[in-house]
Amino acid sequence: MSKEKKYRIGTYLILIPAILFLFPKVYAQHESKTINDSWKFYQGECKAAASATYDDSAWNSIHLPHTWNTDAYTEKKYYQGTGWYRRTLTLPKNWQTKQVFLKLDAASKAAAIYMNGRKIGEHNGGYTACTFDITPFCSFDAPNSLAIHVDNARQDIPPISADFTFFGGIYRDVWLTAVPKQHFHLTNYGSEGIFISTPQVSEEKGTILIRGEIKNDAEQKASLELEHIIYNPDGSIAQTQKQSIQIKGGELYSFRTETSPILSPRLWAPEAPHLYRVESILRDKKTKAILDHSNHHTGFRWFSFDGKTGFSLNGKPYKLRGICRHQDQKPIGVALTDEMHRRDMKLMKEMGANFIRISHYPQDDALLEMCDKLGMLAWEEIPIIDIVPDTPGYAENCENNLREMIRQHYNHPSIITWGYMNEILLVTQRRYKKEEELKPVLERTLSLANRLEKVLKEEDSTRVSTMAFHGSNSYNEVGLGNITDIVGWNLYQGWYGGDLTGFERFLTEQHKKHPSHPMIVSEYGAGSDKRLHSLQPHAFDFSIEYQQKYLEHYLPILEETPYICGGTHWNFIDFSSALRDESMPRINNKGLVYSDRSPKDVYYYYKAAWRQDIPVLHIASRDWTHRSGVQHGKAPVPLPVKVYTNLPEVELFIDGKSLGKQKTENYTVTFQVPFSRKKHFIFAQAENKESDQSISMIEDALHINFTPIPANLNETNLRNLELAVNVGSNCFY
């Protein structure tokens, strides 16, 4: 159950307690709460920690979400190992007659759970949830000891190699849930046991398919009634479905119901994300007491991918304007609050994105809920990256993680594709040079890909499958290119090698060779460091200006090439990658926003390109507030000042003097500005024609300090001149 849905139930309890007293059996007996507070934590191994009587008073007191890897922002060899979490649970007396479940939204990479010294179970996978029935292990007469052992060093669980930090810990919520003996199947791969799809969708009509499982944990049979209420986006009831169920003691009962057609459905799209709500109510047939209760949103939409015409949504061509997103933030790592996840989604939507690659792993439910509500199409994947190892249990863990991801997030209408491999030949080809060594690894990789493709289609035939390849034709040569429905290409021409025009050459070549293959540019990007600026930016200098140049080249190609379904920029944020030793060690700084989520200049370039509904005007290289240049005599020094905008023309002023107007090209305008004194005031304005009768002025301003460097240095002018030299780089620092 989503966090928001639980909050709604809780609010209902507070607002109308009188109704509960009058009709105590009518309200749902499904109780759920987080247990994020009052934990004890120990980093390392402790053999006795699972014991109910173990004294953990010397351990650190923490609250969830939590990670032990804040060291990854400073240490290349960050801690990868084990940790223990413990806390005491006192369970309500009235839970004695119920089934009690423990859910971990995520613990990286592996977790083993103990209650009162007894092992409940374990979970392999650091990015998907797991749920355990803990009823047989609980005490209702005395406090319970809960201990969780977490390990982020396991080599049989994906990922084992990647360009991001494998943060360890219980970094999402932990939940306790109590339900009557008859309830929805809560241990179904960490899902809620209810799956909703829209098998028939058009502008004229649509149907909703609701399927799932009910568990009877009592010994005796039960007569039940299952009701599904479909609510329109405006909250009115569209339809109701009821069925009677006879379920034996200990039985798991499967149900499947399709609604009659809903006429002229409100379609879900990024511009208008209309959501229908499906309320599922399980009752005792005789007493009408509500036993279990669930709410899920769904949306009517259909889509297609085509190798020639690209992507279509609801029958119309639609360009996927996307972003990839990692989930950490310096200095707290991946221990983000729900509101932090929501904030990121709002920032993306504000920029004009309509698509997110949730990479390289499943992320928090709060993020998926925002995708549905804000209108953000989504690609979600499991983290099989770089290489497939010959490790016992690895393939099984990959399969389980894929099933978990699909079942846990199946009901989100925003999701259009599931993925399961990223750049899987990158490390493979580097590590194995000899044919006899490479061949078995390729066979193992192909075998796993085919296995996962089969699982994906069994789990969900309504969405498409995808893999992301690095810029090498070897994927097609070994047969990986023919397995999934669509292919994503991670392309960095002009950054890691080659020149910028290699980007369009590669895409053209792939399209000629495989014209029927739908294609997404699943990664592209260039790093930037706010301390580095350049008048002659070039690849891998990490200057703010080269990131601008790079993206100004890539984005028009993505927008204007019809057979490209779209692209997802790598990455939305500057994220933790502990192995990196670049201008900002331990950070991959390709983000459109900094780690603290303050926007970079290129954020506004995208906003200007993607938001045609609002005016955008932004003076670029905004972090470059102290500039310098070589001055001949007393003549002003001309330096470029760039403005990002979606308005037709821009007028620029320096210290109140107009430098004229210039036409906008590729959402940019660049002026040569005469700098001469220590401090200048730069002011940009543009007319925004709101209607034939209404024109408003859009403005932006920036103070720039300028240091002139005399063309001829001598004893006199050197006395008051601080001359800094950035050795090995042409960047200003």
Positions of predicted regions on the chain:
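Extended substrate-binding grooves/exosites of carbohydrate-active enzymes
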Residues: 43, 61-73, 118, 153, ...
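Extended acidic/polar, glycine-enriched regions
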Residues: 138-141, 211-306
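Compositionally biased, intrinsically disordered or flexible polar/acidic segments
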Residues: 711-733
